[in-house]
């Protein structure tokens, strides 16, 4: 369990926790949506923090709401090192209650990419990467690339 290994826990410092923090994000943040989730984000120089809103309208049973939050926390925990700084608040929609865990995680990743919070994945093309040549290393008769 997470309690036995504290390094695997989702740290409190990476959470949006107070009502005032949520209000700031909802009032000043940008928003993007997906059929399962809605993301409110506010970029900043602070480390990335996650907040979640999963109401009883999404799922009347606590076990269902907690499953959604657990999936989002786990995805965020793995993404923390590469995520851009700022506050991210996820609002679950009612369709999330019927979605599988991978569907929820994928929707979260799509929203983060759309918000520009994650670096774009490298294209899996067949072309080798372009060779970069500094202009000062070229001889006067050699054309630039």
From Swiss-Prot:
Q: Could you tell me the keywords of this UniProt record?
A: Endonuclease, Hydrolase, Nuclease, RNA-binding, tRNA processing
State what protein this is by name. Answer: Ribonuclease P protein component
**Biased composition annotated in UniProt, kind: Polar residues:** 134-145
Q: Which family does it belong to?
A: Belongs to the RnpA family.
Q: Which NCBIfam families match?
A: rnpA
Q: Does this UniProt record's set of keywords contain Protein biosynthesis? A: no
Q: What class of enzyme is it?
A: hydrolase
The family database entries (InterPro entries) matched by this protein are listed as: Ribosomal_Su5_D2-typ_SF, Ribsml_uS5_D2-typ_fold_subgr, RNase_P, RNase_P_CS
Q: GO CC annotations? A: ribonuclease P complex
- Native source species: Xanthomonas axonopodis pv. citri (strain 306)
Report whether Glycosyltransferase shows up as a keyword of the record: no
């Amino acid at each position: 369990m997470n309690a036995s290994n504290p390094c695997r826990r989702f740290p409190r410092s990476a959470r949006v926790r107070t009502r005032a923090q949520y209000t700031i994000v909802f009032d000043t943040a940008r928003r993007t949506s997906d059929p399962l989730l809605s993301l409110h984000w506010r970029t900043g120089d602070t480390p990335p923090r996650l907040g979640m809103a999963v109401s009883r309208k999404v799922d009347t049973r606590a076990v269902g709401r907690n499953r959604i939050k657990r999936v989002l926390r786990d995805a965020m925990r793995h993404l923390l090192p590469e995520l851009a700084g700022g506050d991210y608040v996820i609002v679950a929609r009612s369709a999330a209650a019927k979605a599988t865990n991978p569907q929820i995680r994928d929707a979260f990743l799509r929203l983060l990419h759309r918000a520009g919070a994650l670096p774009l994945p490298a294209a899996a093309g067949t072309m080798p990467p372009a060779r970069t040549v500094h202009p000062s290393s070229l001889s006067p008769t050699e054309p630039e690339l």
